[in-house]
Every structure is written in structure tokens, then in C-alpha cells.
Amino acid sequence: MEQTWRWYGPNDPVSLADVRQAGATGVVTALHHIPNGEVWSVEEILKRKAIVEDAGLVWSVVESVPIHEDIKTHTGNYEQWIANYQQTLRNLAQCGIRTVCYNFMPVLDWTRTDLEYVLPDGSKALRFDQIEFAAFEMHILKRPGAEADYTEEEIAQAAVRFATMSDEDKARLTRNIIAGLPGAEEGYTLDQFRKHLELYKDIDKAKLRENFAVFLKAIIPVAEEVGVRMAVHPDDPPRPILGLPRIVSTIEDMQWMVDTVNSMANGFTMCTGSYGVRADNDLVDMIKQFGPRIYFTHLRSTMREDNPKTFHEAAHLNGDVDMYEVVKAIVEEEHRRKAEGKEDLIPMRPDHGHQMLDDLKKKTNPGYSAIGRLKGLAEVRGTGTGSGA
């Protein structure tokens, strides 16, 4: 596995020198300063590439080239946004960057309710609390029909939870959900958020798949032509939320993608922390079935709680994900490729780490503090070595 590290650009509190000292050789980054939908010019790509290479590293993966909401809703200037996306892929290929992670989650990217969940050892993790999310949706956002997505017990618990929240609790929960987490290219006010949700009122799973198919059929041939590998990131969490459909959550969704556009440029990011939230997702089976199309991996674990829709981010080798078997399956896929004469290692990055030790005193991007990821990278590296990497 190629050891990589996500870096949010020059404003990231974690420097490229830190990344190199952590033992990573590749960088996962994006041009976050370019508005959604606009073309990434060769000039801007080369600027970022030079910064990375001057630090003794390589730009291994783009995460992400964001998809404009008009494409997801199939409205407005979606054709122009698709054309821009095609050009960005051509420009990336021209600059020698050929692995692109992206997602097709509507409105929100990855979502958490608590960004400072204190673990028994005093370190902090990210958490998704199903009851707090229900309290937000029903009592703060006041989304019409939200009650239909929850059990009677969850509705009652959410009402009690909301009643105990201070104004600051409500404001913090709202910020955590809609203000945009690291890597998300959109942040919203509450009113803006309601308006964006309204755009999806007539879009169910079938319709969102239809819109995704339009995107794939336009993008994948260009990626194939220029030698770019597209690696879709799963939904996080991998289930419908806020009345929004999710279409990259299960092995069945993966098969749908392959059936829709059967090109080797149409591939996957194996994010164990996203897929692994669902108990019915067999991650090892996913890797074995779609291994040749896995072009990027995010390795972390989550722990489901008493309410199985509530989870927190566990240590990399703990939690509900059997990381040894996952890494072993990835290494076996790399060996298969080598036997066929291919030399393409699968880039791996230690996904969200715990905020711990000296990082507890620092301002960090949620999930992306240095020391927790350093620990995770070392643990996953050792797991890879032990499994035959």
C-alpha cells in the first residue's frame, strides 16, 4: 500500500514537513480555493503539485473534485458544470495526477453531531448521535415529515434531549451538522439549508441514480481517454438522512455503478469508516468482489452503540471493522495486480484520527489532527506488514 496523508493546503495546521516525518510518501489534496464547478486550470494544479514536490512528497490522489449541486439535481447549468468537470480531469491528467476521489452525496458531505466526543482515555473523537440528529431535524430544522424516519422511541428520546439543550448546545449542534466539515465544499445557514433540501423534494433514490448515471456516462469516457481512475467515496453515514436519498452505501450500489458504466475508469474508494457503519456491509467481501476497481482506501474504524445508528470513531485497529482482514484483502489485491505485471499500489490514508496528546491544546481540523493520524498510520502500516505487504 502506498502510504498517503490528507492535506488541506497551505492553511492546514499540519504542515507537509509533518506529513513527511509521519512516514507518508504521498499527499491527498484538492484545490479547495476554487469554487464548486469551476475548472481547475493547469496553472493552479501545477502550483499545488510544486508545493507538494518541493516538500519531498508526491501528489498521489485528488480528494475531491466536488460535483456541483446542479448536476445532482439535473437542473440549472448542469451541462456546463459537467463540461467543466471533464476539462478538470483532462487538466489533472496533463499534470500527471490520475486518481480522483469524489462523492455524490446530496447537500451534505460527511456528517457528525459531536466533534469533541471524549473517550475514556481523555482523547477526543467524532460521533454521530442518532437521537441528537433527530432532535436537530425535528425541533431545530423542523423538516416536514421528519418523524416518519424515526421510531416512536427515537421521537420521544429526541424530544427529551431537545428539552435539555441550552441555546449554545442547539447552536453547536446546528454548526456541526450544516456549517461544513473538513473536505466539504459547502456550508449553510439554517435558512439556506432548508432551501437546498427543498430542491430535492421530488428526487428519490431512483431519480438520484438517474442523475448520477448522466454524470457517469459523461465523465467516465473522458477519464478512460486520459488515463484517470475515478474512485467514488461512499455515503457517510451510509443511509438516507434528512429525507435525502443515498446511493453509494452498499455492495448493491457498487454493482449498480459497474452495471451502469462498465469501465475500469469507474472505480471505488474503500472507506472502511463509512461502509463499516452498516452492520450488513461485509467489507472484505466488497474488496474481494470489486478489488480490481479499488483505487484508493481510507482506513479507520467505527463503533456502533446501543442505538445501532449511533456510532463514534474508534481507534484505527479497534471498533466494528476487522482491520486486519480488510488490510489483508487489500494486500492480496495488490499481489494479484503484481502477478499480472501491474505496479500500481493502492494509496491508503489513515482516515480520521483521535485528537490526543499535545493536539488537545491546539486548533485542529475535526478528525484531521496530526498525532492521532500518525498513530493510525503506524498501526495500519504494521498491519500491512504483518499481512504480507
Swiss-Prot record:
The keyword Iron applies. GO terms for biological process: D-glucuronate catabolic process. GO terms for molecular function: ferrous iron binding; manganese ion binding; mannonate dehydratase activity. Pathway: Carbohydrate metabolism; pentose and glucuronate interconversion. Its cofactor is Fe(2+); Mn(2+). Pfam families: UxuA (PF03786). The keyword Lyase applies. Signal peptide: none annotated. Keywords: Iron, Lyase, Manganese. InterPro entries: Man_deHydtase, Xyl_isomerase-like_sf. It comes from the Bacteria. Its EC number is 4.2.1.8. It catalyses: D-mannonate = 2-dehydro-3-deoxy-D-gluconate + H2O. Catalyzes the dehydration of D-mannonate. Belongs to the mannonate dehydratase family. PANTHER family: MANNONATE DEHYDRATASE. This is Mannonate dehydratase.
